């Protein structure tokens, strides 16, 4: 049986994982990201247009590059959303055999002059192009600022010229692939969109912000996490209907989805008795962990 995803040494340099799509585990990721459904719908629609409209319309009419950029604070679920998006797109085309390639940008960078540029060019012109020629392909470019750094903000004295050349290579390859491979979609993510080169941003068909969750989303994330734990520790199941739970959920505003789930883990570890028997977890344990998490965020922000 072929393993999904493939993540071994046989993959080309720069490719971290390769998935056959659709894949239910990726669909679960899509469902786990709690955000405005209208935003999800728009994102999915944009990705589908890449495969229905882009191949049939001249680029002089619609200058589509096949690039979507997801931006937002760390922990908001951009990478999971991108993976889930790939599944949902493939699910929309039942007759086509889609593939998801995950790029690991840090394996492409090198201190040796010219090596980063060559590695980037080889990845795009060979590995990605070959996959796109074989069938519809979605490429996840996580932390895209690593490969497409803003050249206007880089000092040639502090940063090797190779970084500039790597960004040049990404832009050149995106243009070539957009021209030759209309059944190819890049989904990029960035925690620091201000660090992404403006020429890369201009090539994006959509730049979508993945925001921190609001009050209702915070509550939904917290309930989902507690319900999952309740399958193993039934006593936790009563917390979502407990007194002050809504207040507790409201206090999560300002935290990202990942941090909210970690808050629950921290609450379980707040007291030895709760750690021994998680059924004893209380709303007050949760509120204490939330206050601590927000205090740490506040201190971290002051240090920057």
Swiss-Prot record:
Chain positions recorded as ATP binding sites: 75-80
Leader peptide range in chain numbering: none
GO molecular function, one term: ATP hydrolysis activity
Pfam family name, one: AAA
Entry GO terms, CC: chromosome
Result of altering residue 143 to Q: No longer prevents second messenger synthesis
SUPFAM superfamilies per UniProt: P-loop containing nucleoside triphosphate hydrolases
Keywords in alphabetical order: Antiviral defense, ATP-binding, Nucleotide-binding
Alphabetized Gene3D superfamilies for the sequence: P-loop containing nucleotide triphosphate hydrolases
Assembly, per entry: Oligomerizes. Homohexamer. Forms a 1:1:6 CdnD:Cap7:Cap6 complex.
Classification via PANTHER family: PACHYTENE CHECKPOINT PROTEIN 2, PACHYTENE CHECKPOINT PROTEIN 2 HOMOLOG
Function: Regulates complex assembly in a CBASS antivirus system. CBASS (cyclic oligonucleotide-based antiphage signaling system) provides immunity against bacteriophage. The CD-NTase protein synthesizes cyclic nucleotides in response to infection; these serve as specific second messenger signals. The signals activate a diverse range of effectors, leading to bacterial cell death and thus abortive phage infection. A type III-C(AAA) CBASS system. Prevents the CdnD:Cap7:Cap8 complex (also called CdnD:HORMA2:HORMA3) from synthesizing 2',3',3'-cyclic AMP-AMP-AMP (cAAA). Binds and disassembles an active CdnD:Cap7:Cap8 complex, inhibiting the complex's ability to synthesize cyclic nucleotide second messengers. An AAA+-ATPase remodeler, in the absence of foreign threat Cap6 probably maintains the Cap7 protein in an open, inactive state. Once activated (presumably by a bacteriophage protein) Cap7 binds to and activates its cognate CD-NTase (CdnD in this bacteria) to synthesize cAAA, a cyclic nucleotide second messenger.
Similarity-based family: Belongs to the AAA ATPase family.
Protein name as annotated: CD-NTase-associated protein 6
Species the sequence originates in: Pseudomonas aeruginosa
């Amino acid at each position: 049986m072929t393993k999904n995803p493939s993540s071994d040494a046989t993959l080309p340099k720069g490719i971290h994982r390769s998935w056959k799509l659709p894949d239910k585990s990726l669909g679960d990721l899509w469902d786990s990201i709690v955000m405005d459904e209208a935003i999800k719908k728009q994102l999915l629609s944009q990705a589908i247009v890449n495969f229905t409209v882009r191949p049939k319309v001249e680029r002089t009419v619609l200058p589509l590059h096949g690039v979507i950029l997801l931006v937002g604070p760390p922990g908001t679920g951009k990478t999971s959303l991108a993976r889930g998006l790939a599944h949902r797109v493939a699910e929309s085309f039942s007759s086509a055999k889609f593939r998801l390639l995950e790029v690991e940008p840090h394996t492409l960078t090198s201190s040796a002059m010219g090596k980063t540029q060559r590695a980037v060019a080889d990845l795009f012109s060979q590995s990605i192009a070959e996959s796109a020629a074989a069938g519809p392909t979605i490429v996840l470019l996580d932390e895209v600022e690593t490969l497409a750094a803003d050249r206007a903000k880089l000092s040639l004295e502090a940063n090797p010229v190779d970084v500039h050349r790597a960004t040049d290579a990404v832009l050149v390859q995106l243009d070539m692939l957009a021209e030759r491979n209309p059944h190819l979609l890049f989904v990029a993510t960035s925690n620091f969109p201000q660090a992404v080169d403006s020429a890369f941003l201009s090539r994006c068909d959509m730049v979508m912000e993945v925001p921190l969750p609001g009050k209702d989303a915070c509550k939904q994330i917290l309930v989902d996490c507690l319900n999952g734990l309740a399958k193993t520790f039934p006593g936790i199941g009563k917390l979502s209907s407990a007194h002050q739970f809504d207040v507790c959920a409201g206090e999560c505003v300002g935290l990202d989805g990942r941090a909210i789930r970690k808050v629950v883990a921290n609450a379980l570890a707040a007291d030895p008795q709760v750690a021994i028997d998680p059924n004893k977890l209380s709303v007050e344990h949760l509120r204490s962990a939330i206050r601590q998490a927000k205090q740490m965020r506040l201190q971290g922000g002051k240090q920057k």
